[in-house]
C-alpha cells in the first residue's frame, strides 16, 4: 500500500508539471540557449559531469588530474615554501573601459552563467612571461617553473569575455566568497602550442558589504536577462570599468588548471586575486535570482502542440571556449558565429524566478600541483 501511494504521488507530481513545475538554472523550458554536446547544469556542482562535447570528445571533468577550481593555500604556506613568482615574471594587466555604442557590448544569460561579451576590437590585454628561448614544447603555464633570473619573453593575452559564478568557485584558505568573476583571455602568438589558442583566466573574488551597491557591477547587473539563451545590449554610452574591477592590491595566486565547466579542458594558466572586491547584499540577491529556480507554466493548447514554432537567435562573433588544444592539435577557429539552437516552442511557457540559485563547481584536488604567489609591486 505504501508503495502504491508513493507511485500515486509521483504520478500526480508529473501530471502537475504539465502545467507548472520548478526548474533549476540551465533546464528552464522557455530557454533559447544553444545546445552543443551532452546537457549539463550545476545541480550537483560538477560531481556528475560525465559526457561528450558537440564533436563527440569525452569531457575530462572526472578523469583530469589538473582540474579547477581549487582551495588556494594560505599566504604563509606559499611563503614558507618559497613558492613565489619573481617580480620580473609577474603577469601585467591593462584594461581600459569597455564602451557600448548600443549594440557592441552584450550581457548574456546562456543558461550556465551571466556573461559579458563585446563585438569590437577591445584594447585590453594581459602580458604573461614565457622563457626567452622557447620552442614547440613550451606552454603558457611554463612561467610556473621559471626561476627569478631566467631570461623572459612575454605573450599578449587578449580578454574575450567575462562571466560570474555564485558562490565563489575558488576558496582562499578554505573561505568561500559570495561571487567570483572570471575574465577569460586567449593567447595565439609566439608559442607553437598556442597557434590554435591557449587560455588564461583571471579570477576576482567578491565579499559581502553592508554599504551601497558596487557601482562597477551596476551596468552589468542592471541589464542581466532573466531568460536563458537571451542577451541585453548595454545602452549606448554605458561603460564597464573593467580595469577598476581588478583589485588595487594585485597580489595573486597562480597555478595550472582547467575550465570549470564541461568539457573541463586542462592546460589553462589561472590567476586568482587574493584581495576581494565588494558586492552589496542587494546585488548578490539579484544575481542569484538571475541564475535562480524558475516556476514555468505552459500556455500551449493541445492544438498548438503539433505546430511548434522554431526560434533562432543570432548572437555575434565571439571567442567560443571548446577545448584547449595540445601542442600537436590542428589550429581551431575559436572566433565564429554562434546561432542559438532551435527549441520546441520555448515561447509556449511563462517562467518566473521563485528561489535563489547557484552556478559553481566544487573545489578539486590539487594533486601536488605547483601553486605560486605573486606579491605585486
UniProtKB/Swiss-Prot annotation:
SMART domains on file: Carb_anhydrase
Reactions the enzyme catalyzes: hydrogencarbonate + H(+) = CO2 + H2O
Enzyme class: lyase
Residues reported to bind substrate: 260-261
Residues at the active site: 112 (proton acceptor)
InterPro entries per record: Alpha_CA_prokaryot-like (IPR041891), CA_dom (IPR001148), CA_dom_sf (IPR036398), Carbonic_anhydrase_a-class (IPR023561), Carbonic_anhydrase_a-class_CS (IPR018338)
Enzyme Commission number, as recorded: 4.2.1.1
Cofactor(s) demanded: Zn(2+)
Coiled-coil stretches: none
SUPFAM superfamilies reported for this sequence: Carbonic anhydrase (SSF51069)
Places the protein is found: Periplasm
Gene Ontology MF terms in the entry: carbonate dehydratase activity; zinc ion binding
Quaternary state and interactors: Tetramer of two large and two small subunits linked by two disulfide bonds.
The family this protein is said to belong to: Belongs to the alpha-carbonic anhydrase family.
Role this protein plays: Reversible hydration of carbon dioxide.
PANTHER family, alphabetized: CARBONIC ANHYDRASE (PTHR18952:SF265)
Name of the molecule in the record: Carbonic anhydrase 1
Organism of this sequence: Chlamydomonas reinhardtii
Name of the gene encoding the protein in the UniProt record: CAH1
Amino acid at each position: 500500500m505504501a508503495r502504491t501511494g508513493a507511485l500515486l504521488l509521483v504520478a500526480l507530481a508529473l501530471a502537475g508539471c504539465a502545467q507548472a513545475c520548478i526548474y533549476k538554472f540551465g533546464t528552464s523550458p522557455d530557454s533559447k540557449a544553444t545546445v552543443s554536446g551532452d546537457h549539463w547544469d550545476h545541480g550537483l556542482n560538477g560531481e556528475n559531469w560525465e559526457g561528450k562535447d558537440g564533436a563527440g570528445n569525452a569531457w575530462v571533468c572526472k578523469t583530469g588530474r589538473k582540474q579547477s577550481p581549487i582551495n588556494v593555500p594560505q599566504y604563509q604556506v606559499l611563503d614558507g615554501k618559497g613558492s613565489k613568482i619573481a617580480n620580473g615574471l609577474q603577469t601585467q594587466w591593462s584594461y581600459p573601459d569597455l564602451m557600448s555604442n548600443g549594440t557592441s557590448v552584450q550581457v548574456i544569460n546562456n543558461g550556465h552563467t551571466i556573461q559579458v561579451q563585446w563585438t569590437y576590437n577591445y584594447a585590453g590585454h594581459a602580458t604573461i612571461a614565457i622563457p626567452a628561448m622557447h620552442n614547440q614544447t613550451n606552454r603558457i603555464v611554463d612561467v610556473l617553473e621559471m626561476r627569478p633570473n631566467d631570461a623572459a619573453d612575454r605573450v599578449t593575452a587578449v580578454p574575450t569575455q567575462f562571466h560570474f559564478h555564485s558562490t565563489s568557485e575558488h576558496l582562499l584558505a578554505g573561505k568561500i566568497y559570495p561571487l567570483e568573476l572570471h575574465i577569460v583571455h586567449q593567447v595565439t602568438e609566439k608559442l607553437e602550442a598556442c597557434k590554435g589558442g591557449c587560455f588564461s583566466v583571471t579570477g576576482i573574488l567578491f565579499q559581502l558589504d553592508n554599504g551601497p551597491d558596487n557601482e562597477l557591477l551596476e551596468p552589468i547587473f542592471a541589464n542581466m536577462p532573466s531568460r536563458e539563451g537571451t542577451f541585453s545590449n548595454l545602452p549606448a554610452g554605458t561603460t564597464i570599468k573593467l580595469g577598476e574591477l581588478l583589485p588595487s592590491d594585485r597580489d595573486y595566486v597562480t597555478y595550472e588548471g582547467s575550465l570549470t565547466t564541461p568539457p573541463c579542458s586542462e592546460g589553462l594558466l589561472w590567476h586568482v586575486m587574493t584581495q576581494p572586491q565588494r558586492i552589496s547584499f542587494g546585488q548578490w540577491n539579484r544575481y542569484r535570482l538571475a541564475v535562480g529556480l524558475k516556476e514555468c507554466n505552459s500556455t500551449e493548447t493541445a492544438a498548438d502542440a503539433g505546430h511548434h514554432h522554431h526560434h533562432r537567435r543570432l548572437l555575434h562573433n565571439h571567442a567560443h571556449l571548446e577545448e584547449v588544444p595540445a601542442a600537436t592539435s590542428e589550429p581551431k577557429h575559436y572566433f565564429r558565429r554562434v546561432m542559438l539552437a532551435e527549441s520546441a516552442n520555448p515561447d509556449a511557457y511563462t517562467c518566473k524566478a521563485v528561489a535563489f540559485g547557484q552556478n559553481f563547481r566544487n573545489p578539486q584536488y590539487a594533486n601536488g600541483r605547483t601553486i605560486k604567489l605573486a606579491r605585486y609591486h
